[in-house]
């Protein structure tokens, strides 16, 4: 099982490391995330380096989730996968049963790119709509720190929440 990490900053200050385990029974989805953590695929169709490094969590909703992974636009409207722009929902084996799950953000069926979210509570209403592909194994305290960040009315953090460094362990 692959393990990836995010070294996070909030408002430019180090906030700690989040370590995530990727599930083997969603191999295509997990591989997309892993490769975007390492940045090994180089420049993507958008002309941007295909990596989460330097990207932000653009949406934080307490008692729900933290969303990030838009490395092309940074506002939730962009992102791309290692397979091209978008890819299909792989399966819905895993359910949104606990905090700390890693799941794909999308704009409807078959629209997975690079955006993901980390749950901060169980979110069963997302089952069958979003592909769960991993879980936080260390650094839930960092997730809680991000969750507590003040946001504007559009759920955008007032202090920049950035993935300063990321990769595979």
Curated annotation (Swiss-Prot):
Domain of life: Eukaryota
BP term (GO), one: protein folding
Locations listed in the record: Cytoplasm
N-terminal signal peptide: none
Pfam families xrefs: Pro_isomerase
Catalytic activity: [protein]-peptidylproline (omega=180) = [protein]-peptidylproline (omega=0)
Keyword list, A-Z: Cytoplasm, Isomerase, Rotamase
Gene Ontology annotations for the cellular component aspect, listed alphabetically: cytoplasm
Keyword Zinc: no
An example molecular function term from Gene Ontology annotations: peptidyl-prolyl cis-trans isomerase activity
InterPro entries hit by this protein: Cyclophilin-like_dom_sf, Cyclophilin-type_PPIase, Cyclophilin-type_PPIase_CS, Cyclophilin-type_PPIase_dom
Mechanisms controlling activity: Binds cyclosporin A (CsA). CsA mediates some of its effects via an inhibitory action on PPIase.
Every PPIase cyclophilin-type domain range: 5-168
Protein purpose: PPIases accelerate the folding of proteins. It catalyzes the cis-trans isomerization of proline imidic peptide bonds in oligopeptides.
Protein name: Peptidyl-prolyl cis-trans isomerase
């Amino acid at each position: 099982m692959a393990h990836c990490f995010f070294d996070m900053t909030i408002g430019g200050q180090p906030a700690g490391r989040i370590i995530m385990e990727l599930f083997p029974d969603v191999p295509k989805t997990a591989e997309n995330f892993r490769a975007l953590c390492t940045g090994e695929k180089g420049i993507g169709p958008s002309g941007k380096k295909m990596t989460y490094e330097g990207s932000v969590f653009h949406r934080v909703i307490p008692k729900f989730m933290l969303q990030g992974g838009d490395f092309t636009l940074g506002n939730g409207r962009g992102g791309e996968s290692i397979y091209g722009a978008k890819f299909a929902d792989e399966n819905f084996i895993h359910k949104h049963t606990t905090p700390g799950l890693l799941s794909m953000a999308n704009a409807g069926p078959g629209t997975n790119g690079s955006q993901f979210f980390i749950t901060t509570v169980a979110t069963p209403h997302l089952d069958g709509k979003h592909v769960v592909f991993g879980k936080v194994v260390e650094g839930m305290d960092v997730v809680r720190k991000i969750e507590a960040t003040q946001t504007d009315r559009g759920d955008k953090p007032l202090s920049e929440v950035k993935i300063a460094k990321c990769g595979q362990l």
